[in-house]
Amino acid sequence: MYRLIVSDYDGTLNVNDKPLSQNFFTKLNMHACRGGIFAIASGRPYNQLKKILFQVSQNIVFISDDGAQMMYKNCVLYKKTVDIPDAKALCSKALDNGFTAICALREENRSVKREQLSLPFFMNSDIFKIIIVKDGENTDILKAAAQTLNLRVCYEDKDYLEFCHKEANKGEAVKKLMQKFSVNENQMLVLGDNVNDISMLSLTKNRVFPQNARQEVLDLGGTVVENVEKYIIELK
């Protein structure tokens, strides 16, 4: 059994929005009892991941917000937050152009009001991501603005555009985790399906992909499996 197992959630463990099985939770608890570490690495916020994995929440590491935050046993192991001046600048640009801007905080997402931009404290919590509601509009002006700040696009679909600190990614968080628990690349297994997983998949040759993985991910080389949850349950 690997000392450290790191898995993406959406598209990897969660493919058809089916709840994870009791056998999976039992496996993670057994892995922890043997001194192993399991980390879930996702673009989702910490509070969502904790609810999904509440049965094992005290035994696993949560890497949330595309690597911007890492939590273990309710303690912060690592974070790379959005700088307040950058958050204000991007949110101001978004509001000026008619977009809704949302700040992803540790425990909640909070919409930004224009009057907040003039306040010195702005938000009373760390900002891990800035989420823009696209409403079918072109967001190139916001992407251009981000390039002048310490921000990068970490996720985009037809409805949302998300920014995080340009140095925040899953790979950097996993590196910190490896250092903390003295794990080398041969003792680690990483599972993922999308381009935002490449930074952590590149840290080891022990890579597993679901069948639906993006071609850029498959090109890294690794094992392709039909069901990631079943694969983890059956690990020896």
Model feature map: region roles:
Residues 9, 44, 193-194:
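Active-site metal-binding loops of divalent metal-dependent hydrolases
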Residues 39, 63, 189-191, 208, ...:
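Hydrophobic/aromatic beta-strand patches that form the interior of the parallel beta-sheet core
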Residues 1-7, 23-26, 179-183:
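Non-catalytic pre-domain segments flanking phosphatase-related domains
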Residues 16-113:
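Active-site phosphate-binding/coordination module
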Residues 184, 203-236:
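Asp-based, Mg2+/Mn2+-dependent phosphohydrolase catalytic module
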Residues 2-18, 201:
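Asp-based phosphoryl-transfer active-site loop
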Residues 93, 97-203, 212:
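Conserved acidic, metal-coordinating active-site core of Asp-based
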Residues 23, 48-51, 141, 173, ...:
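Phosphate- and divalent-cation-binding pockets in alpha/beta enzyme and binding domains
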